[in-house]
A protein has these predicted regions:
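ABC ATPase nucleotide-binding domains
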Residues: 255-285
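Catalytic Walker B motif of ABC-type/P-loop ATPase nucleotide-binding domains
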Residues: 176-179
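Conserved catalytic motifs of ABC-family nucleotide-binding domains
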Residues: 172
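Helix-to-loop junction immediately C-terminal to a conserved catalytic motif
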Residues: 65
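Conserved ABC ATPase signature
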Residues: 151-155, 159
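Conserved ABC ATPase "signature" region
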Residues: 81, 128-146
Length: 285
């Protein structure tokens, strides 16, 4: 297992790397989000990006998809340096990606069929007969062909997530990006989504990035895992390698302990001094 951002770069052939995040630095306001962050996503594999809340996991996806630009370092996707691409080129690159967000983001005023058909109608000029075939095929793949005429309000959370997944794959993407796909799901729905992620990756020949803090779920499907903390990759390897790590940060994250390098309390003045100070201030007023 590697436990530094520099060492996290796997020695994979260039044509085997779909996304290469190299020595990236990124700030929001005066806050450093990433400092020399490096991650590689290899073709045909499921790569898990994990870390405590607020470590910038979703921000990394925004950088990869060109929604934000790095301050330093470089991100290449299929060999294209994102920072050098025009808006039109980034748009074209995104056509090769599918994205599944934690809230599903279904359009509430159209039915399931039209939600899945939406990207096809927006980005292609396919005949209606072919759109129908493609939509029903993708809905069948996620087990919801029979729900094509339902409205989003009639769906459970797990069903809505599956509809969103069908929509994400309807354009036959090469790279599928999942941002917190397990949030709010019951155990059965969670198991279904895990199964679909694995089967989609294998059956459709996809490359997948899964951002989540659900350690045990990711361990069942991920080929490669990166743990981000403090703006850097603190550990990388297979899920089994992370589980066997001796790093205090990794152990705390993997076990869910409140005792470790990631503090429970937000930085604050001395407790007693602050209480006494507030009390005296109140009396003076």
């Amino acid at each position: 297992m590697q436990n530094s951002s520099a060492a996290a770069r796997a020695s994979a052939p260039a044509n085997d790397v779909v996304v290469d995040v190299r020595d990236v630095r990124f700030h929001i306001g005066g806050r450093a989000i990433f400092s020399d962050l490096s991650v590689q996503v290899r073709r045909g594999r499921i790569t898990a990006i994990m870390g405590p809340s607020g470590t910038g996991k979703s921000t990394l996806l925004r950088l990869i998809t060109g929604q934000a630009q790095v301050d330093a370092g470089k991100i290449t996707v299929w060999g294209n340096d994102i920072s050098t691409l025009s808006s039109r080129q980034i748009y074209a690159l995104r056509q090769r990606m599918g994205m599944l967000f934690q809230n599903g983001a279904l359009l509430t005023d159209i039915d399931v069929f039209e939600n899945v058909a939406f990207p096809l109608r927006e980005h292609t000029r396919l005949p209606e007969s072919l759109i129908r075939t493609l939509v029903l095929t993708k809905l069948h793949a996620v087990g919801l062909r029979g729900a094509a005429e339902l409205m989003p309000a009639e769906l459970s959370g797990g069903m809505a997530r599956r509809v969103a997944l069908a929509r994400a794959i309807v354009m036959d993407p090469e790279l599928l990006i999942y941002d917190e796909p397990f949030v709010g799901l019951d155990p059965i729905s969670l198991g279904v989504i895990l199964k679909l992620i694995r089967e989609m990756n294998e059956g459709l020949g996809l490359t997948s990035i899964v951002v989540s803090h659900d350690v045990h779920e990711l361990a069942t499907i991920a080929h490669d895992s990166y743990l981000i903390s403090g703006g850097q990759v603190v550990a990388s390897g297979t899920p089994k390698e992370l589980a066997a790590s001796g790093s205090d940060v990794v152990k705390q994250f993997m076990t869910g302990s409140d005792d470790g390098p990631v503090p429970f309390h937000y930085p604050a003045p001395d407790y007693r001094a602050q209480l006494i100070g507030d009390s005296r201030k109140g009396k003076a007023e």
